[in-house]
Curated annotation (Swiss-Prot):
<keyword id="KW-0543">Viral nucleoprotein</keyword>
<dbReference type="GO" id="GO:0019029">
    <property type="term" value="C:helical viral capsid"/>
</dbReference>
<keyword id="KW-0687">Ribonucleoprotein</keyword>
<dbReference type="GO" id="GO:0030430">
    <property type="term" value="C:host cell cytoplasm"/>
</dbReference>
<dbReference type="GO" id="GO:0019013">
    <property type="term" value="C:viral nucleocapsid"/>
</dbReference>
<keyword id="KW-0946">Virion</keyword>
<dbReference type="Pfam" id="PF00945">
    <property type="entry name" value="Rhabdo_ncap"/>
</dbReference>
<keyword id="KW-0167">Capsid protein</keyword>
<keyword id="KW-1139">Helical capsid protein</keyword>
<dbReference type="InterPro" id="IPR023331">
    <property type="entry name" value="Rhabdovirus_ncapsid_C"/>
</dbReference>
<keyword id="KW-0597">Phosphoprotein</keyword>
<dbReference type="InterPro" id="IPR023330">
    <property type="entry name" value="Rhabdovirus_ncapsid_N"/>
</dbReference>
<comment type="function">
    <text>Encapsidates the genome in a ratio of one protein N per nine ribonucleotides, protecting it from nucleases. If expressed without protein P it binds non-specifically RNA and therefore can bind it's own mRNA. Interaction with protein P abolishes any non-specific RNA binding, and prevents phosphorylation. The soluble N-P complex encapsidates specifically the genomic RNA, with protein N protecting the genome like a pearl necklace. The encapsidated genomic RNA is termed the nucleocapsid (NC) and serves as template for viral transcription and replication.</text>
</comment>
<dbReference type="InterPro" id="IPR000448">
    <property type="entry name" value="Rhabdo_ncapsid"/>
</dbReference>
<comment type="similarity">
    <text>Belongs to the lyssavirus nucleocapsid protein family.</text>
</comment>
<feature type="modified residue" description="Phosphoserine; by host CK2">
    <location>
        <position position="389"/>
    </location>
</feature>
<dbReference type="InterPro" id="IPR035961">
    <property type="entry name" value="Rhabdovirus_nucleoprotein-like"/>
</dbReference>
Amino acid sequence: MDSDKIVFKVHNQLVSVKPEVITDQYEYKYPAIGNQKKPSITLGKAPDLNKAYKSILSGMNAAKLDPDDVCSYLAAAMELFEGVCPDDWASYGILIAKKGDKITPTTLVDIIRTDVEGNWAQTGGQDLTRDPTTAEHASLVGLLLCLYRLSKIVGQNTGNYKTNVADRMEQIFETAPFVKVVEHHTLMTTHKMCANWSTIPNFRFLAGTYDMFFSRIEHLYSAIRVGTVVTAYEDCSGLVSFTGFIKQINLTAREAILYFFHKNFEEEIKRMFEPGQETAVPHSYFIHFRSLGLSGKSPYSSNAVGHVFNLIHFVGCYMGQIRSLNATVISSCAPHEMSVLGGYLGEEFFGKGTFERRFFRDEKELQDYELAEATKTDLALADDGTVNSDDEDFFSGETRSPEAVYTRIMMNGGRLKKSHIRRYVSVSSNHQARPNSFAEFLNKTYSGDQR
């Protein structure tokens, strides 16, 4: 008998079918570079840098920027930011630079130029007659790259948040070593003219390149990174959340995963830790894989590892973390089951730190302490472990073990305890819940279930 088939009757006729569902039609692409070639883009003909500066500044003042010209200028301006490589720099087998080499952002990537001329129109404001200084170039580059960060701020941020961010970034590029090149609020006005800079592949690529360079190279103009920092680990919220989670509960990745009691974690954990990726390598191309075009569909995003993401943020909610309460629930990834597991794990790791003495007045005090601790361990091993079951949580050294937590969940029928529900309701009801957030989910799901 075929175990994949089901049998039933239609009009007294026996029917046998094999149920099949649509599979994910988009394959996740891992960012590892196999061809030993640096990430690359193609742009128009390289402009005269000073002419390009005047055109772009004019366009910014008139809120009429040409994205192709902006990208061409940003790529050309990279030559102004020379720094010294502090160590041999390699990623995915590609030697980027050797220790002591003088490099610019263009060293990291391959920018191919065609013979197509840019527009370089003077669209507004007074023409600049003199050639700009390096500081003026740096200020304009910084302001242009700020458009990337502004376009990444989503609509759910209310009030004047985006305007305030724009104003603060503008102030950076009015202060030494930068110089003021535009009037106040020009950045926000320019952003409103085109709010989708982060969706322009070449602009995103250049923002990621600048960020990768300034994150490693000490430079006078490193503050340019204020606009590009959001390209680091972009579309990587699942992996980033997991990293923050293990630091928070003070476990290794291996130890934390032992608590993931659900079959749907299997594929996601396999996906997150695919061999051959440089997830833990500092200054790797991996960090900017999305902006550098190395992955079309990230295997590390919250949607790619939705069960892991949901669990982590339910634990975060239990601990009262604002970031988790505000995060968006991945509704297709068993949020009810994840909230149950999150309640038990939150209880285990919330307010129950691992405390021990680590610092001593002198070596003798350290030796005395270690001897006393060894004696305690010997006594514990000699104990037959027979304690009243009601007091087990207070006496057992294994209360936090994955086995013990799993047993407690099973003994409670896979349901939350009253104390879990009270905690969830407490943290979510006192929070201004955003639509589809974890706070809203907990409020709607458990506020009427305080048994």
